[in-house]
Each structure stands twice: as C-alpha cells, then as structure tokens.
A protein has these predicted regions:
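Carboxylate/His-rich catalytic cores and anion/metal-binding grooves
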Residues: 134-175
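Beta-sheet entry/capping signal
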Residues: 82-83, 131-136
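Residues that form generic nucleotide/phosphate-binding pockets
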Residues: 113-116, 120, 169, 173
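Sparse, context-dependent recognition of short Cys/His-centered cofactor- or disulfide-binding micro-motifs
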Residues: 9, 121, 151, 155
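Segments forming glycine/polar-rich beta-alpha architectures that bind adenosine-containing cofactors
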Residues: 120-133
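Conserved, charged catalytic cores of large soluble enzymes
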Residues: 178
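Surface-exposed loop/turn and secondary-structure junction residues enriched for glycine/proline
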Residues: 105-108, 132, 169
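Acidic/aromatic-lined carbohydrate-recognition and catalytic surfaces
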Residues: 1-79, 84-111, 115, 126-127
C-alpha cells in the first residue's frame, strides 16, 4: 500500500500539481532564497516558483502598531515596508515518492484522494466493502503549519495554510477582497 491511504497516497494524487499542498508566503523579498523543507513535515517555505498574489505597503508606528496599510502594485514604491504575498506550491519530497503532500483544504483534491484510495478498496471488494473494510483510518491529515512573526518589526518569511479557493470563499463570506 506504500504508506497509503495515508495523506500521501503514495504520491499518486499529487503527481498532478493542482492537488499539492499550498501555502501563502508573506515576505519582504519577492525573490529570496529557497527555504522549502521537503521532508515529511507540513512546513511551508519558499520554493523558488512562487506566484505573486498581492503586494502591500505597511506602515508601523515607533512602537510597532499598525498605522496604515494598502494594497499596491508590485512596481509601486512603498512609503513603509513593502510586503509580498506569494502562493507557494509544495515541492517534491522523497518521503512522498518524489511528489508532495495533498492539499487537504481543497475539496477537489480530497475527492481525488478518496477516488484513488477508498474507491480502489471498494472496487476490489465490491459489495463486501463495509464488511471486509469496515473502516479506513488515518491520523495524519494536515495542512501547512502556520508560522508567526516574533514581533511586529520582524521581517522573516512566514507561511500560512492556503488553497486556491480561499479568495473566493472569503469574498463570499465577508463581501470583500482578502
């Protein structure tokens, strides 16, 4: 079973990049050093292939409190600190047979995972599925570990969980762009 139906499904699902785990990288350097950790942990990082989603001009007061922020274009000059929001798709890892972990925040990715794993068991044992395979257990569902700044003046890269539908779902729920 090659470590599946655990969260990796032997890399079978994430051969298709659209099903791979993602993170939102918040950084002051659009083209910084690659930091993606490709072991079995759910830590995001810079892959070197980040897609720019947004750019912000952030101004803090002398005590580190937010004075103002606004979304700007990538080539605009910032009055404060320019922050980039980059979409990073998890890279290949030997732990996942040179694939990546699943985007468990994506309904489409999870459906594909179930198709490749659970539905294969059902196909094999047919009507005996709920008897021969009474349950399928995994203790590993995860998504990118959320990182935080040490303080408001920190400019280290941080990652947070992300999936492609976040912007659409946010707008639907709150009536505003993220």
């Amino acid at each position: 079973e090659d470590r599946w139906p655990s969260g990796a499904a032997g890399g079978l699902v994430t051969k298709d990049e659209k099903y791979r785990a993602r993170c939102l990288l918040i950084t002051t350097e659009k083209d910084g050093e690659v930091t993606q950790n490709n072991d079995s942990r759910a830590e995001g990082g810079r892959t070197g292939n980040g897609k720019l989603l947004a750019c912000y001009d952030v101004i803090l007061d002398k005590d580190g409190y937010l004075e103002s922020y606004k979304r700007i274009n990538e080539n605009d000059e910032a009055k404060g600190t320019k922050w980039y929001a980059l979409l990073e798709i998890h890279g290949k890892s030997s732990w996942y047979n040179d694939q990546a972990y699943l985007d468990t925040l994506s309904v489409e990715a999870v459906k594909k995972f179930v198709e490749v794993t659970h539905e294969k068991y059902k196909e094999t044992v047919g009507n005996e599925f709920d008897k021969t395979v009474p349950a399928i257990f995994t203790d590993e569902p995860q998504f990118t570990r959320k990182q935080v700044f040490d303080n408001s003046f920190d400019t280290e890269d941080v990652c947070m969980p992300w999936t492609d539908s976040v912007e659409e779902l946010y707008k639907k729920a709150y009536g505003a762009d993220i």
